Amino acid sequence: MIYGVGTDIIEIARVQGVMERTRGRFAEKVLGADELAKYHARKARSERRGLAFLATRFAAKEAFSKAIGLGMRWPMTWRAMELMNLPSGEPTPICHGELAQWIAERGITVRVSVSDERDYAVAFAIAERGGHAAVPENPA
């Protein structure tokens, strides 16, 4: 059963502007530890791909927060949910701490899709309840 849906779109140039104004601290505020490591690896290869990665993760967190009905309020925080990829490439939300507990208590599963083009990054999330395992705290 559908619990909620969420979507977000962001202009990549806006993310670039925030990164310049914050001297890169924006990435540290928004990304979890595993996401941050992946961001730095992508940025080292291509500044543009690093920004696109950051923008898709920002959009994914916004879409995820809307799908679960909390918005960006406790226990949903920027770093409480990381969007990582399975070996197949499928993006998978990984929840930590109190958010993982909140999701598990409600039996919610969330699927997220992200995409980016030259100017924009977009994310869509669908939260379901019943008949599925909850979003894991740690990838298997």
Curated annotation (Swiss-Prot):
Cross-referenced InterPro entries: 4-PPantetheinyl_Trfase_dom (IPR008278), 4-PPantetheinyl_Trfase_dom_sf (IPR037143), ACPS (IPR002582), Ppantetheine-prot_Trfase_dom (IPR004568)
EC number of this enzyme: 2.7.8.7
GO biological process terms, semicolon-separated: fatty acid biosynthetic process
Highest taxon of the lineage: Bacteria
Keyword rRNA processing found: no
GO molecular function: holo-[acyl-carrier-protein] synthase activity; magnesium ion binding
Cofactor: Mg(2+)
GO cellular component, one term: cytoplasm
Gene3D superfamilies in UniProt: 4'-phosphopantetheinyl transferase domain
Keywords, in A-Z order: Cytoplasm, Fatty acid biosynthesis, Fatty acid metabolism, Lipid biosynthesis, Lipid metabolism, Magnesium, Metal-binding, Transferase
Compartment(s) where it occurs, according to its Swiss-Prot or TrEMBL record: Cytoplasm
Binding site for Mg(2+): 8, 62
Enzymatic reactions: apo-[ACP] + CoA = holo-[ACP] + adenosine 3',5'-bisphosphate + H(+)
Keyword Lipid metabolism: yes
Family: Belongs to the P-Pant transferase superfamily. AcpS family.
Functional note: Transfers the 4'-phosphopantetheine moiety from coenzyme A to a Ser of acyl-carrier-protein.
Record's protein name: Holo-[acyl-carrier-protein] synthase
Source organism (scientific name): Cupriavidus pinatubonensis (strain JMP 134 / LMG 1197)
Organism lineage: Bacteria, Pseudomonadati, Pseudomonadota, Betaproteobacteria, Burkholderiales
Gene: acpS
